[in-house]
UniProtKB/Swiss-Prot annotation:
GO terms for biological process: photosynthetic electron transport chain. Under iron-starvation forms a complex with PSI trimers, where the trimer is surrounded by a ring composed of 18 IsiA subunits. Its cofactor is chlorophyll a; all-trans-beta-carotene. This is Iron stress-induced chlorophyll-binding protein. GO terms for molecular function: chlorophyll binding. Its main location: membrane. Belongs to the PsbB/PsbC family. IsiA/Pcb subfamily. It comes from the Bacteria. The lineage of its organism: Bacteria, Bacillati, Cyanobacteriota, Cyanophyceae, Oscillatoriophycideae. Functions as an antenna for photosystem I (PSI) under iron-limiting conditions, when phycobilisomes disappear. In the (PSI)3(Isi3)18 complex most of the harvested energy is probably used by PSI; in other PSI-containing supercomplexes a large part of the energy will probably not be used for light harvesting, but rather is dissipated to protect the organism from light damage. InterPro entries: PS_antenna-like, PS_II_antenna-like_sf. GO terms for cellular component: photosystem I; plasma membrane-derived thylakoid membrane.
Length: 342
């Protein structure tokens, strides 16, 4: 992390993973523990939503954010359109159990594993990294891309072979047996991606994304960063963090818009009607139907949450990018605190 030439910087607990920036073993432990928290939240919140779900009311008008996703995946949808929450309970329980396994892994890396993988033996040593080592950072990036590609292919497998997805056009759960593979169709969505209106194109797009992610993962594992990349990019903990935050911000803004207007990936039956864009102190997405006071559709909750989280991630990206380039924010504080010359 940026220390401004001070080798003895001490980070408090609130600095998060900055405390472990130079301890690759502890860094992995922190990431596994973070994954445990995410999975625990998903499981616990799924069970919480089940506890107040009312099958007599539209799902999109019950302040739900996780059950609509599960329903969109074709889970819990009976032949007559009724919702069976038993699969949701099973999924929530599996997430809770998985979070315990991940938490145990995090504790192992923190308490029993080597603090620095440089001292590890066996395959673990391969994942030691230094922030100034582009080759090793590329290898770690490659493994991340492989996992993301696997996630894309899991959705494809669910759509094509394991029960299918919910199709809002027919209001049924069906297998997607002929996903779109025409590159002209897939890449034709570049300027209007949120207008996609059929499952075949969505699943075909995930096939393309999965192939690109896996190919990119293999490339980065085998091929070190090229010279042009080394010249253009900064390789440091602060810079890598800024790149990650920028990517998450972009994904958040895209997800917010997609959720707000698309009714194929986000069916009206589960998320409520499309939203309007409003402008107050800040931009926001507003419901287009009348609801009781302080009630919002699932679409409104998700779109606005993604938008505002993306906004703050963008601020984090800019903050850490400037620090990575050497800008010292303490200078701003000093200038503001000094009295103006008479």
């Amino acid at each position: 992390m940026q220390t401004y030439d001070n080798p003895d910087v001490k980070y408090e607990w609130w600095a998060g993973n900055a405390r472990f920036a130079d301890l690759s073993g502890q860094f992995i432990g922190a990431h596994v523990a973070h994954a445990a928290l995410i999975v625990f939240w998903a499981g616990a919140f799924t069970l919480f939503e089940i506890s107040y779900f009312d099958p007599t009311l539209p799902m999109g008008e019950q302040n739900l954010i996780l059950l609509p996703h599960l329903a969109t995946l074709g889970l819990g949808i009976e032949g007559n359109g009724a919702i069976n929450t038993e699969p949701y309970f099973v999924i929530g329980a599996i997430h809770l159990i998985s979070s315990a396994v991940l938490a145990a892994g995090g504790l192992f890396h923190v308490l029993r594993g080597p603090q620095d993988l440089k001292t590890a033996t066996g395959p673990a040593r391969r994942f030691h990294f230094d922030w100034e080592d582009p080759k090793q950072l590329g290898l770690i990036l490659g493994h991340h891309l492989l996992l993301l590609g696997l996630g894309a292919f899991l959705l494809v497998a669910k759509a094509m072979y394991f029960g299918g997805l919910y199709d809002t056009a027919t209001q049924t759960v069906r297998l997607v047996t002929e996903p779109t593979l025409d590159p002209a169709v897939i890449y034709g969505y570049q300027t209007h991606f949120a207008t996609v209106d059929n499952l075949e194109d969505i699943v075909g797009g995930h096939i393309y994304v999965g192939v690109l992610l896996v190919a990119g993962g293999i490339w980065h594992i085998l091929v070190p960063p090229l010279q042009w990349a080394k010249k253009v990019l900064l390789f440091s903990g602060e810079a890598i963090l800024s790149y990650s935050l920028g990517a998450i911000a972009l994904a958040g803004f895209v997800a917010a818009y997609f959720c707000a207007v698309n009714t194929t990936a986000y069916p009206v039956e589960f998320y409520g009607p499309v939203l309007d864009v409003k402008l107050s102190i800040v931009p926001y997405f507003a419901d287009t139907i009348e609801l009781p006071m302080n009630e919002h559709t699932s679409r409104a909750w998700l779109a606005n949450a993604h938008f505002f989280f993306a906004f703050f991630f963008l601020q984090g990206h800019l903050w850490h990018a400037l620090r990575a380039m050497g800008f010292d924010f303490r200078r701003v504080e000093k200038v503001l605190s000094d009295p103006l010359d008479a």
